[in-house]
Amino acid sequence: MASGDTLYIATDGSEMPAEIVELHEIEVETIPVETIETTVVGEEEEEDDDDEDGGGGDHGGGGGHGHAGHHHHHHHHHHHPPMIALQPLVTDDPTQVHHHQEVILVQTREEVVGGDDSDGLRAEDGFEDQILIPVPAPAGGDDDYIEQTLVTVAAAGKSGGGGSSSSGGGRVKKGGGKKSGKKSYLSGGAGAAGGGGADPGNKKWEQKQVQIKTLEGEFSVTMWSSDEKKDIDHETVVEEQIIGENSPPDYSEYMTGKKLPPGGIPGIDLSDPKQLAEFARMKPRKIKEDDAPRTIACPHKGCTKMFRDNSAMRKHLHTHGPRVHVCAECGKAFVESSKLKRHQLVHTGEKPFQCTFEGCGKRFSLDFNLRTHVRIHTGDRPYVCPFDGCNKKFAQSTNLKSHILTHAKAKNNQ
């Protein structure tokens, strides 16, 4: 991850010119823990690792570190256990050797005074306009592990958290929650930072990384969030939804062949019109031979969908983003440009999908409609009534839903 173009802004008490003491607005975004290399300063064997990290033969901190090699020898008696997902940096001030400095990856949207763009980082990591800002860890103790730093920095809005330096340099306030739409402000030499608010009138969307723990381990996802509901602590929402018991069971399997148990569907009373309507709205899911359990929950607030693996969940997650692709004809908005293009066929009257069965030739604007139509010819009826003793099958899910209502009405009339 280190590169020759990386810019470091030191906060070790060095004075800065008055004209760049003003607050610069930056957006802080967490990154997956896997992408940061953990290094330990202080062991004899560590000298060999310097060459691998781009340090060269004289133990200089190559790749943008630029520290003299002899500092490594001052540190041999300061042995600390490795920090999780943090990269310690050696300071030029010998009095500061016992302080670890954590690296925060910052994604900026505007020019930061006093530095070049870090092009090397941009190429490797896929971020734009990044700088690395070492923030001295709080002095005072045994606290060698700074846990969850990468998670709690995300789009921080709550004021709180430490990172203040004993040497009187700058500090970054880190919020504990996952609130979005707020900005963190970094003050170069003033030694203080405050959380400002975003414009309350505008609904702002931004992407942020969220750390998710599952039984299989931890992983990180990028998700969209708007600043509409600032009073929600996102972290608690994620924790609640990941636990399988708290998520509603997936009843859609009853739409394609699984029969209802004798007592009806657990948790659903089909004689209640509201619950029945909810059941009828469920989309059928394709049954696979190797159907793995769905243990990964969508972390978006209010979404109860479950997925078999992380990649499926990530693919779904972007659907919660802002609908920025708007149809000029009717104003309908879509998350993806491809969905807008497909929708525009409705206005153009274009029907590119044609039934190839002999003597038919019907045309459709959407491939989905053609697939549904073809079942008329093939006799494929995948939607099976879930009620015991009823073996009716249907080519379209809407027909099955209408049929289910007849069972419910008959039950109510008894």
From Swiss-Prot:
It is found in: Nucleus matrix. Changing L366V: In GADEVS; uncertain significance. Zn(2+) 4 binds at C385, C390, H403, H407. Residues 1-170 are annotated as: Interaction with the SMAD1/SMAD4 complex. Zn(2+) 2 binds at C327, C330, H343, H347. The modification Phosphothreonine is found at T378. The record marks D119, G120 as: Cleavage. Phosphorylation at Ser-118 by CK2 prevents proteolytic cleavage by caspase-7 (CASP7) during apoptosis. Residues 257-341 are annotated as: Involved in nuclear matrix association. Gene3D superfamilies: Classic Zinc Finger (3.30.160.60). Residues 333-371 are annotated as: Involved in repression of activated transcription. InterPro entries: YY1-like, Znf_C2H2_sf, Znf_C2H2_type. Residues 33-81, 157-203 are annotated as: Disordered. Residues 42-55 have a biased composition (Acidic residues). There is a cross-link at K182, K183, K208, K230, K286, K288, K409, K411 (Glycyl lysine isopeptide (Lys-Gly) (interchain with G-Cter in SUMO2)). Zn(2+) 1 binds at C298, C303, H316, H320. Changing H320Y: In GADEVS; uncertain significance. Multifunctional transcription factor that exhibits positive and negative control on a large number of cellular and viral genes by binding to sites overlapping the transcription start site. Binds to the consensus sequence 5'-CCGCCATNTT-3'; some genes have been shown to contain a longer binding motif allowing enhanced binding; the initial CG dinucleotide can be methylated greatly reducing the binding affinity. This is Transcriptional repressor protein YY1. It comes from Homo sapiens (Human).
